[in-house]
Amino acid sequence: MDFYQKLFLGNLIFTVIGFLVPLCFYQKLNGGKNIAVLSGVSASLCGLIGAGAVLINNEIFSYSGWIIISILNIGVKIDNLAAFFLLIVNFLSLINFIFSQGYLKGQNYKNVVMLSLLNLFSLSLSGVILADNSLLFLLFWEMMALISFVLIMFEHQSTNAKLNSYIYLVITHLGTAFITCAFLLLYLKTGSINFADYKNLGQTLDGLTLNILFICALIGFGAKLGIFPLHVWLPRAYGLGPINVIALMASVMIKTAVYGLCRFYFDFLGNSFLWWGFFLVASGIISALYGILLAVLQNNIKRFLAYSSAENMGIILISMGLALIFKHFDQTALAALAFFTVLFHSFNHALFKGLLFICGGVIFTQLKSLELSKLRGLNKKMPYTAICFLAGVMSLASLPPFAGFVSEWLLLQNLFQLLFYLTNPVLRLLVIITLALVLLVGGLAVIGAIKNFGVAFLGKTVAEATEITEKNQWFKVSQGLLVASLLLLGLFPQHFMAVVNNLVANYFVPLSHNSLFLTIPQQAGTLKDLNLALIFG
């Protein structure tokens, strides 16, 4: 058994222990909650180390076996793309288990059940990314959907709560139906369920089939992303679920959909039509603008963060669309930069969204509310949480020195490069409009950040906050790790690029943080030799 097998087997074993032991032996175990948390932390560390090693060493780990009948093939593979998203899953799961240790007080059965399910939920998230065939992928995808549905309803049994939970379940299964259709079409064309047989099918499939696959993947994974108009489950689910559950859903679960889109568009389909890229850009800007407009209007921190997720997933879609556009024009260096933006913002969003929900959880444990009308002057009683929340909303609003600023800069740079490359005046006008709308989205995000931080933490302290304390060290550790990560990612993006450079190079060309200059071709109007450098070049 090699190094990777030991680590990922350890991840599986610790997860199973964290799920089954506290649940089955609750009455005989006084510390069932502690066992669930410790197992979750151990499993996350194993997955984190394994995924990091695969990514840095540019290696591939794979395993295949058979269970019950031959069609149920356990095909597991970790390439650079899977390793990157496994890093997100395991790092945020690690933070979440640390936070949950402080958030769920007592050894009562309800807390033990929730933590046991969180272990299983974390396994399903990893399973989606580890799967190397369509059947196993759909199995873990459905497992992820059902467990998240149960966890969302965990604290609420009212008719309205059930209705909102079922809305989430319906939309997520609508997405599953389209993903299943895409995999069925791939099976009909290849006669295989293995992902290895789907690689670069864009070179052999006809145009109609490719377009159907593109649309099915976008709707299927878009439902989980929460892009417009499939975003309606976000405020409903986020408003219902326990904070520790929603923190994991918002930071990690929707990234499995980003992974799915990357796997389909860059791995399976390979070649792309020009309209795909522009359609993704248009879908992304609509989602981003609609999401941030609704986010700014909210007077509840949970709902603000829910709608801002639609905005941030829109940003990722725009970057993905730009990568496809540049790839269509065979501008691999520009496509590489756009793809890097997808990866960077995926990690950035996972960090700050997890941080903000955890900060919200800290507030909720003290005041039992996240309505802005009931929150005032919390910085006087919760200075540590105030600093952490400020760091989170600064990254959300793309303000330096945090990672969000780098994400915004990279996106704007991608759009400027597309503007200089295009010669069609209509397309250039559309890019200019997109640039303006992206800047508008950024401005509205700043307004939302100021509103939520200003109302909750500044001003006169509300009477209910007079007894607030910040003595929970589990909260401080989880918040501090995420703030430090956002700051390091914002100050040293070149190190992040060094880690994911092999992944970018697998699809396009390597990026250099020392001397990368992108030359706009002669066809780009009067600008023949305009050199644009990365901000860390």
What are these regions (language model features)?
Residues 1-9, 18-116, 192-203, 502, ...:
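Transmembrane helix-loop-helix hairpins at membrane boundaries of multipass inner-membrane proteins
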Residues 61-70, 196-201, 410-425, 496-527:
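Membrane-interfacial helical/loop segments at transmembrane boundaries in membrane proteins
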Residues 95-112, 118-137, 147-470:
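Hydrophobic transmembrane alpha-helices and their helix-loop junctions in integral membrane proteins
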